[in-house]
Each structure stands twice: as C-alpha cells, then as structure tokens.
C-alpha cells in the first residue's frame, strides 16, 4: 500500500493544478479568442468564439466536479489505475493549457486537450461509479 499512498496526494495536486489553469483560462480567454479569429473580425464572430470557449471550459469544470466527487468520496481514491490515468492526464493538461494560454494557441486545440486530458479521466471515473454503486464491487 506504500506506493498507492504516494499516488493519492499526487493525484490531488495534479487535479488542482489543472483546475487552477482552467480558471486562469476563464479570466484570460480574450487573447486566445483573438488568436482563433482572422485579423479583421466582427463582434459577432468574437462573441461566437467566446461562447464556444466558455462552453468548453464549463463542460471541463463539470467533469472536474465528477472527478472530484469520486475522488473525495473515496470511490476511486485508492484505485491505482484510476490514479495513474488521472495523474497523467491532468499533469499533461496543466502543461498543455499553460502553453495554450501563453502561446495563444487556436481554440480548436482546446478540444484535443479536453478529450484526452479531461474527458478520458472523467469517463473512467464514471465507470468506477457504476462498478462500485451499480455492481457493488470494491473499487480496488
């Protein structure tokens, strides 16, 4: 159990790091929205890109809620497979989203980061919910 106990704080810290970067992106999304648009754009085009990015970030926050609920309730806290998936995904997301903010990547890039770094661990977390509560099996 010694190796698993080291995964718990690592998972929590990478999850929070990813959450902080997503919240930072909410605050500073203007430069990324402008990077998605041509040099001359209309306010309608700007608003459309803004709504798309806000929707993507909102879905990401919803998936954070799912993952934090599973983690903090203990459903997946000591599951080493879920911990490794979560650590890898959220660590990658923290780095990739930092580049997304500072390098002003296009908005379509966010969807790739979203699928591999937010949706994947959330789907595996929901599978653990089904396993634990639906099938009444131990999570580890």
UniProtKB/Swiss-Prot annotation:
Protein purpose: Plays a role in cilia formation and embryonic patterning. Requires for normal Sonic hedgehog (Shh) signaling in the neural tube and acts in combination with GLI2 and GLI3 to pattern ventral and intermediate neuronal cell types. During ciliogenesis regulates the ciliary transition zone localization of some MKS complex proteins.
Localisation per UniProt entry: Membrane; Cell projection, Cilium
Subunit details: Part of the tectonic-like complex (also named B9 complex). Interacts with TMEM237, TMEM231, MKS1 and TMEM216.
Annotated keywords: Cell projection, Ciliopathy, Cilium biogenesis/degradation, Developmental protein, Disease variant, Glycoprotein, Meckel syndrome, Membrane, Transmembrane, Transmembrane helix
Membrane topology value: Multi-pass membrane protein
Glycosylated residues, chain numbering: 79
Gene Ontology cellular component terms for the protein in this record: ciliary transition zone; membrane; MKS complex
Sequence intervals crossing the membrane: 7-27, 53-73, 83-103, 113-133
Disease involvement: Meckel syndrome 13: A form of Meckel syndrome, a disorder characterized by a combination of renal cysts and variably associated features including developmental anomalies of the central nervous system (typically encephalocele), hepatic ductal dysplasia and cysts, and polydactyly.
UniProt-recorded name of the protein: Transmembrane protein 107
């Amino acid at each position: 159990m010694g190796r698993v106990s080291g995964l718990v704080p690592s998972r929590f810290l990478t999850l929070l790091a990813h959450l902080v970067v997503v919240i930072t992106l909410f605050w500073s999304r203007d430069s990324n929205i402008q990077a998605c648009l041509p040099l001359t754009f209309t306010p309608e085009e700007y608003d459309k890109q803004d709504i798309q990015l806000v929707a993507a970030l909102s879905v990401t926050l919803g998936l954070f809620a799912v993952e934090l609920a599973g983690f903090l309730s203990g459903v997946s806290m000591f599951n080493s497979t879920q911990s490794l998936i979560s650590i890898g995904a959220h660590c990658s997301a923290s780095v990739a989203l930092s580049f997304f903010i500072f390098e002003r990547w296009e908005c379509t890039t966010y969807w790739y980061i979203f699928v591999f770094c937010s949706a994947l661990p959330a789907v595996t977390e929901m599978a653990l919910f089904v396993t634990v509560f639906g099938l009444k099996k131990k999570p580890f």
